[in-house]
């Protein structure tokens, strides 16, 4: 599952995730930004791309909500960052974009993992 596909179809990814969360087994870290001016003037079939793909941190998805919903529903999998989609950070800047996405996604899920010293099993 990834939110970019829902946004490109003008589907609210958070509303969909709330319904599907228990069925998610893999998560892609890919995003998009919907250009609502283009949609309002030309519709979704305009010559201009109304929803260019982005790496997380540069798009419209609320990744804090994504992680919260998945956590509340028992998701323990990883997030695979999909690169090579954001033209602003293409070529020599690709790894910069992907590292930013990694740091951003870690922040959205609550930061680096710190074990609870009082959680004795």
Predicted features and spans:
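Histidine-acidic metal/acid-base catalytic patches
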Residues: 1-121
């Amino acid at each position: 599952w990834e939110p970019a596909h829902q946004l490109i179809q003008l589907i609210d990814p958070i509303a969909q995730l709330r319904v599907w969360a228990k069925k998610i087994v893999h998560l892609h870290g890919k995003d998009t930004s919907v250009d609502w001016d283009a949609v309002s003037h030309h519709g979704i079939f305009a010559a201009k791309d109304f929803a260019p793909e982005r790496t997380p941190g540069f798009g419209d998805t609320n990744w804090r909500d994504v992680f919260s919903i998945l956590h509340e529903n028992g998701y323990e999998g990883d997030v695979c960052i999909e690169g090579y989609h954001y033209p602003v950070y293409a070529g020599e800047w690709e790894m910069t974009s992907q590292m930013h996405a990694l740091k951003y996604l870690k922040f959205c899920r609550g930061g680096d993992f710190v074990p609870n010293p009082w959680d004795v099993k």
